[in-house]
């Protein structure tokens, strides 16, 4: 593999010699006919390029008699491209006009000045079709320095020290919900977002505007396409298949955007340590319909149905762990099976009314339903052995058996949810002033039944041991329901103006929220400011944002971990956030780049502590903690290779919490001492998050492209089950993953109905790294406890074919 990669890299540096040349020259202007300095001019697929001077002028020599494509780009503007074929010694002049817009990068677009004044990152949904990924669109989010996820099987993600439940997701201004009974990435299917149907995506990692709801960590704002012409696509791989079609009626009054997806992770799961029969099946169908009644009145419908089924019959597994001096191996044999089902549906009707160019009104009525079932009975019998790891040992044979035992896991969990929502949002724009407002009411009806337990038999003794009864190791039982009403409203205003030597954007507003279950009324004021110096030559913008962010509980958060009952006095978790940042557009090696850096601090109060196992979160159901999170982040996007965009990102973060009134006692030399743990790491505390995405093409053969993604994240805290949070003193191994892909694009000149056709070969987990996701605790014959790691997927190749019409 190393020799192959080395040969591939050497191929990239090959140069093309041209015997006859022509000249391509001209000027680059913006929409106001002003010259664009430092615009990047390249001949696609070659190393030929130049940058414009102060007058916007450029001149390049190109090979004569060949079909070439010239691309002109500058950060913050839509690229200009032109296909040419020049005669020997011919001089061709052009005036290229660049319009302000978005230059899509793999992880973010570099928007125009107006876009850069709003805190957030624009993402390209189509890049998920090209990069090697085992998941869906969310893998693009995981490339950002503020986002962490140590599980390639899951679409869930943490943002700046928050957990999975602290992230907002909107599609066409409709909130998207995630499954509640999911406990592992193996159970997860397709996320709501269908990249084939998406037109724009905005992600904010914190300190977002009042219009974006009531969560503490992040918001993902997605808009689906309103097509203007016919289009379709088909994708097939070893992990599933997608198809989508979009188009309009002849009079363009009716438009449609429909997608169908199928996914199976059986191929991936076969690379895990536990062998067995995996039978996952995930199906998702979506439709977005648009009808223009008049020029000012538009009707929309968004529908989604998702069916995820997961059947699992484990057979046996073998896991090695420990250290060089204390190497261990556990062999496990299983009986039983797990059968899960997750069905959900969404239907939303909206009316968009634009009475004038200044005023826009939208009315939405939506409904969401979910039905989830998780059932399993699995008996696991294990044998724990010490391994011979002395120098010269080649077999790794067992030296001695130090533990024998079994686990019996049982669950009958059911969750039903129904949400009906009515919402109105409006926007009024006057000159440089923009006013937004909105009101919303939700009716929620949930039914939540949990019945699960674990029996632990170690060396013929049931743990915990009792002379009088057989006790269960873990139990979780609840039978609860909840009907409630949520109401919210917001108003915000933003104003653009010129100050001495700077363009300034100032925005602010307040959000209100009320929940009938706990009778709590909340107000969340928020302010943001951006300044772009105009008397500086560097193209830089500085940003500041602050505000209060409240997260009203859900039924899952309100369920007490102690007895499974609902806590009607549970308050919203809250945080005060401050974010300062800057972004800087610059040229390096004559090519465009962008640096984005941010620092943040969050003080959190009324926290509801929780434990995490794999992707399952269980809350205490009490406001008994306060904490903080702080960090710095930096990301550089740009053309490391001419004509292609790559990135590198780094995030440093700490998040701690102090659980009130927690303590333990210890005895030292017959003296009993009371210890108060104080601030302890939160379950999402991850010091370093580092990522690279790199893409390249073969000179003289630009239809061959190579993609490489790398992710490194330091270990997360963990501790034994049924223990206090301060006992989570262990750290998982660092998450390390490299994914590689190579693709070939084909052009069918005779079949012009095929717009794009490409085949890619992907290699997931190229280095075959064993990444931990959770631990199982067992006891040996000496009474010592061991945390046996559960590993994620190993190396796996994948073949993918994409056709666009």
Model-derived regions: residue spans:
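Face-selective signature of the C-terminal outer-membrane beta-barrel domain
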Residues: 292-307, 337-518, 596-599, 647
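Surface-exposed extracellular loop regions of Gram-negative outer-membrane beta-barrel proteins
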Residues: 316, 533-578, 599-624, 709-723, ...
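Short, acidic, small-residue-rich periplasmic hinge/interaction motif at the N-terminus
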Residues: 29-31, 39-44, 71-77, 87-130, ...
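Gram-negative outer-membrane beta-barrel transporters
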Residues: 496-504, 601-603, 623-720
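Transmembrane beta-barrel wall of Gram-negative outer-membrane proteins
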Residues: 233, 239-262, 275-315, 338-363, ...
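Short acidic/polar hinge/loop motifs at secondary-structure boundaries
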Residues: 59-61, 130, 175-203
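C-terminal beta-signal and adjacent terminal beta-strands/loops
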Residues: 646, 711-721, 744-805
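Membrane-embedded beta-barrel scaffold of Gram-negative outer-membrane proteins
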Residues: 362-366, 572-639, 759-764
């Amino acid at each position: 593999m190393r020799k192959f990669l080395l040969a591939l890299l050497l191929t990239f540096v090959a140069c093309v010699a041209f015997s006859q040349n022509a000249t391509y020259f001209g000027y680059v202007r913006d929409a106001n006919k002003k010259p664009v300095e430092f615009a990047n001019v390249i001949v696609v697929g070659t190393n030929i390029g130049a940058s414009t001077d102060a007058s916007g002028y450029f001149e390049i020599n190109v090979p004569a008699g060949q079909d070439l494509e010239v691309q002109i780009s500058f950060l913050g503007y839509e690229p200009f491209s032109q296909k040419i074929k020049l005669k020997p010694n011919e001089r061709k002049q052009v005036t290229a006009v660049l319009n302000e817009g978005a230059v899509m990068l793999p992880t973010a677009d570099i928007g125009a000045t107006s876009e850069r004044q709003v805190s957030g990152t624009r993402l390209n949904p189509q890049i998920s079709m090209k990069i090697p990924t085992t998941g869906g669109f969310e893998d693009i989010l995981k490339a950002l320095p503020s986002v962490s996820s140590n599980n390639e099987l899951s679409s869930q993600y943490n943002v700046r020290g928050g957990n999975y439940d602290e992230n907002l997701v909107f599609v066409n201004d409709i909130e998207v919900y995630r499954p509640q009974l999911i406990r592992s990435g193996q159970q997860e299917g397709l996320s709501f977002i269908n990249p084939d149907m998406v037109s724009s995506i905005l992600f904010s990692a914190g300190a977002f505007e009042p219009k974006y709801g009531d969560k503490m960590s992040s918001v993902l704002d997605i808009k689906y396409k309103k097509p203007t012409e016919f289009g379709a696509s088909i994708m097939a791989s070893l992990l599933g298949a997608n198809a989508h079609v979009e188009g309009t009626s002849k009079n363009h009054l009716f438009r449609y955007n429909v997608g169908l997806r199928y996914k199976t992770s059986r191929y991936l799961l076969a690379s895990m340590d536990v062998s067995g029969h995996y039978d996952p099946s995930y199906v998702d169908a979506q439709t977005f319909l648009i009808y223009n009644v008049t020029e000012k009145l538009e009707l929309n419908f968004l529908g989604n149905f998702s069916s995820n089924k997961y059947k699992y019959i484990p057979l046996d597994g073998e896991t090695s762990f420990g250290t060089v001096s204390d190497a261990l191996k556990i062999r496990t044999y299983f009986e039983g099976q797990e059968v899960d089902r997750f069905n959900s549906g969404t239907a939303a009707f909206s009316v968009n009314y634009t009475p004038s160019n200044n005023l826009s009104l939208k009315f939405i009525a939506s409904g969401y339903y979910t039905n989830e079932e998780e059932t399993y009975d699995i008996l696991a019998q294990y044998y724990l052995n010490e391994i011979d790891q002395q120098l010269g040992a080649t077999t790794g044979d067992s030296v001695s058996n130090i533990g024998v035992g079994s686990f019996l896991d049982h669950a009958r969990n059911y969750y039903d949810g129904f949400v009906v929502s009515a919402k109105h949002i409006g926007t009024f724009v006057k000159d440089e002033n923009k006013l937004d407002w909105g009101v919303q009411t939700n009716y929620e009806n949930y039914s939540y039944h949990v019945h699960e337990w674990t029996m632990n038999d170690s060396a013929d003794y049931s743990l915990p041991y009792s002379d009088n009864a057989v006790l269960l190791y873990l139990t979780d039982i609840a039978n609860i329901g909840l009907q409630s009403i949520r109401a919210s409203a917001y108003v915000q205003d933003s104003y653009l103006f010129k100050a001495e030597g700077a363009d300034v954007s100032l925005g602010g507003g307040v959000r209100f929220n009320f929940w009938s279950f706990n009778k709590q009324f909340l107000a969340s004021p928020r302010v943001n400011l951006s300044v772009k110096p105009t008397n500086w030559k560097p193209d830089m913008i500085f940003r500041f944002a602050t505000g209060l962010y409240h997260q009203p509980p859900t039924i899952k958060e309100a369920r007490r971990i102690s007895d499974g009952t609902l806590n009607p006095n549970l308050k919203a978790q809250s945080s005060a956030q401050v974010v300062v940042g800057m972004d800087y557009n610059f040229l390096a090696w004559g090519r465009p780049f962008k640096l984005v850096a941010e620092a943040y601090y969050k003080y959190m109060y009324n926290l509801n502590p929780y434990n995490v196992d794999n992707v399952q979160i269980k809350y205490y159901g009490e406001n008994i903690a306060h904490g903080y999170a702080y960090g710095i982040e930096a990301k550089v996007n740009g053309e490391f290779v001419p004509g292609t965009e790559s990135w590198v990102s780094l995030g440093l973060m700490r998040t701690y919490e102090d659980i009130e009134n927690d303590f333990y006692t210890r005895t030292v030399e017959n003296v009993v001492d009371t210890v108060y743990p104080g601030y302890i790491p939160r379950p999402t505390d991850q010091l370093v998050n580092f990522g690279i995405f790199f893409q390249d093409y073969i000179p003289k053969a630009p239809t061959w492209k190579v993609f490489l993604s790398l992710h490194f994240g330091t270990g997360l805290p963990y501790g034994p089950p049924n223990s206090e949070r301060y006992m989570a003193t262990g750290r998982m191994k660092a998450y390390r993953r490299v994914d590689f892909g190579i693709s070939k694009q084909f052009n069918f000149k005779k079949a012009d109905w095929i717009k794009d056709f490409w085949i890619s070969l992907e290699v997931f987990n190229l280095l075959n790294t064993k990444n931990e996701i959770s631990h199982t605790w067992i006891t040996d014959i000496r009474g010592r406890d061991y945390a046996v790691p559960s590993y994620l997927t190993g190396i796996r190749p994948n073949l993918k074919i994409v056709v666009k019409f």
